[in-house]
Amino acid sequence: MSIEERVKKIIVDQLGAKAEDVKPETSFIEDLGADSLDTVELVMALEEEFDIEIPDEEAEKIATVQSAIDYVQNNQ
């Protein structure tokens, strides 16, 4: 699975979103109804899946599907 596919799967699993709703421009909060706890859990799942550390100030910037994919690709 590609990084993009793995990130999308985590988003579907963590937020209960439909796979077809998880597009690059999709916002976790505005489009998928995530709250701040959901986004924290999402970041933790990304850290675990990709064995990376995402500092809080960086985690706050991860608000869309594409921003999550970009962060993982740039920090692996």
From Swiss-Prot:
Question: Does the record's keyword annotation contain Cytoplasm?
Answer: yes
Question: PTMs?
Answer: 4'-phosphopantetheine is transferred from CoA to a specific serine of apo-ACP by AcpS. This modification is essential for activity because fatty acids are bound in thioester linkage to the sulfhydryl of the prosthetic group.
Q: Which GO terms describe its cellular component?
A: cytosol; membrane
Which GO terms label this protein's molecular function in UniProt?
A: acyl binding; acyl carrier activity; phosphopantetheine binding
Task: Tell me which residues bear O-(pantetheine 4'-phosphoryl)serine.
Answer: S36
The record's annotation in SUPFAM superfamilies points to:
ACP-like
What does the sequence similarity comment in the record state about its family?
Belongs to the acyl carrier protein (ACP) family.
- What biological function has been recorded for the protein in this entry? Carrier of the growing fatty acid chain in fatty acid biosynthesis.
What's the protein name?
Acyl carrier protein
* Organism the protein comes from: Glaesserella parasuis serovar 5 (strain SH0165) (Haemophilus parasuis)
